[in-house]
């Protein structure tokens, strides 16, 4: 009807997360944000740096979850280098609600989940927010580059804009954090960790659907996860890595199985975080196995090789 305010109906593309939101804006109403924008006020977020003093004082660095098996193996590498990294839980349904509270629901699901993980942890009361930093990987070309801005915006909205957000990237993003440096030695150990993670994940998913004794594959997997973490805590050598890989394969080969290879194999592909994160994919591997199939998930190393090949 002429002269009436227009109603903007915003339909979410996130299935069953939130209802459609209705917003109305009357003619002539100018928000404070629009006034600032028109006056040329900068909306850039402050960039608190993570300093060497913060590292030496043992500040907690929160790292959001993506690939539980792999990231769990990366933590000992950071701790060995003097960083007090705390990896967030792999299954956390409250993270989605927290993300929707602080991130516009038009943003993609991975961005909501990652921001939600961090905000839920920051506001949990478990950590001293005056001695807290956040670590987030940055790639480029999509929302993965926007994570850091989304997190800073969310922190600022609850009065915690002083928390440093560290961008972990091999590209020049204009971020300066003198207290956080990834050394060639750390990178070398990380390659071992990711290869261990890929191997253990593939061995587990290949054997668990056929195990004779329920839980035996998980127990063997956890044994080798603990062993690999101990190695990474003191530093892995190439000869030790080769021996460990052979022993892992031999142990899983010796696991009592029934009907190996007879079940349909179901591949899991797609966006990197959703593919690996149990909460993001609604425990898709467990669902596949409960339905009498075998899940096949490509390794995380393949993702990085794909990126390298693409230049």
Residue ranges and their predicted role:
Residues 1-311:
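An N-terminal assembly and electron-transfer interface module characteristic of large anaerobic redox
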């Amino acid at each position: 009807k002429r002269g009436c305010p227009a109603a903007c109906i915003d339909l979410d593309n996130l299935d069953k997360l939130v209802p459609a939101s209705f917003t109305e804006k009357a003619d002539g109403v100018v928000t404070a944000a629009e006034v600032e924008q028109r006056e040329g006020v900068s909306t850039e977020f402050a960039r608190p740096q993570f300093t060497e003093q913060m590292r030496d004082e043992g500040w907690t660095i929160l790292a959001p979850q993506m690939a539980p098996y792999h990231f769990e193996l990366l933590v000992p590498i950071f701790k060995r280098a003097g960083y007090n990294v705390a990896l967030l839980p792999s299954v956390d349904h409250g993270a989605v609600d927290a993300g929707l509270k602080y991130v516009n629901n038009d943003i993609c699901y991975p961005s909501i989940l990652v921001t939600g993980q961090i905000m839920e942890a920051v506001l949990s009361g478990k950590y001293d927010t005056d001695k807290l930093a956040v670590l987030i990987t940055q790639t480029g070309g999509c929302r993965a580059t926007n994570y850091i801005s989304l997190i800073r915006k969310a922190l600022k909205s609850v009065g915690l804009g002083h928390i440093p957000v560290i961008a972990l990237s091999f590209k020049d993003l204009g971020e300066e954090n003198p207290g956080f440096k990834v050394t060639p030695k750390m990178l070398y150990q990380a390659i071992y960790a990711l290869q261990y993670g890929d191997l253990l994940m593939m061995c587990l998913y290949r054997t668990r659907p056929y195990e004779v004794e329920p839980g035996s594959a998980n127990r063997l997997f956890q044994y080798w996860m603990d062993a690999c973490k101990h190695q990474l805590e003191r530093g892995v050598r190439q000869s030790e890595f080769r021996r460990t890989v052979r022993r892992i394969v031999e142990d899983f080969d010796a696991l009592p199985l029934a009907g190996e290879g007879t079940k349909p194999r179901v591949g899991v592909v797609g966006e990197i975080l959703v593919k690996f994160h149990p909460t993001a994919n609604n425990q898709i591997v467990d669902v596949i196995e409960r339905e009498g199939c075998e899940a096949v998930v490509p390794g995380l190393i393949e993702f990085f090789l794909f990126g390298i090949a693409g230049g």
